[in-house]
Every structure is written in C-alpha cells, then in structure tokens.
C-alpha cells in the first residue's frame, strides 16, 4: 500500500492557520509551527478578554458617573443611593452617557437624588 503524504489537506490546514496569523511579528506569521501556537494563544486571549471587556466598561462608566456626580456635590455612592430612593431606574451605561453628552440632564438627575436623600 503506497504512502499518503497529505497533499492538499495539509496545505489547506497550513494556509488556514497562516491566514489567521497574518499581521503577527517575526516568525509567527511565516513559520507554521510557531504560527499555530500563536493563533491558539491569540484565541485564548480573545476569549478571555471578551469576558473582561464587560467589567472594563462598567469601571469606565462608574469613573465617569463619579466625576460628574462630584461636580454636582455628590459622591458616586450617594448619587446611586439617591436615584434608587427616588425611584429613578437608570443603568450605569445611560448615566455615563448623560454625564458626558448632556450635563444639564445629569444635573437634574443629581438634584432629584439629593432631594431623595
């Protein structure tokens, strides 16, 4: 029985990995063995960081809300507590957007939170 060397299957597999490794530095975009490891590691980083991104955005929103709240004489925690007591149910993403793009609306919310405290 003759020996089978892989041929098109091997070439297709290597091309797929090297295509994914396009743009990597050094040997990582040229040599199949190195590229294969880096593509695997890159996939792990992407998987991990898709989950971490949620927390990073939440931290960014809280920092923005806190800065705007302090400009209106409240701390972040007092603002959030005041909004909850006033029955204003807004998520942090919306509050951060208001803090950056519509300072007057945020100020009105801060006043409502102060009244509720």
Curated annotation (Swiss-Prot):
Gene Ontology terms for molecular function: rRNA binding; structural constituent of ribosome
Gene3D superfamilies in alphabetical order: 6.10.160.10, Ribosomal protein L20
Keyword Transcription part of the UniProt annotation: no
UniProt GO BP: ribosomal large subunit assembly; translation
Family: Belongs to the bacterial ribosomal protein bL20 family.
Protein function: Binds directly to 23S ribosomal RNA and is necessary for the in vitro assembly process of the 50S ribosomal subunit. It is not involved in the protein synthesizing functions of that subunit.
Primary gene name: rplT
Signal peptide as annotated in the record: none
Any single Gene Ontology cellular-component annotation: ribonucleoprotein complex
Keywords: Ribonucleoprotein, Ribosomal protein, RNA-binding, rRNA-binding
PROSITE patterns named in the record: RIBOSOMAL_L20
InterPro entries: Ribosomal_bL20 (IPR005813), RIBOSOMAL_L20_CS (IPR049946), Ribosomal_protein_bL20_C (IPR035566)
Official protein name in the record: Large ribosomal subunit protein bL20
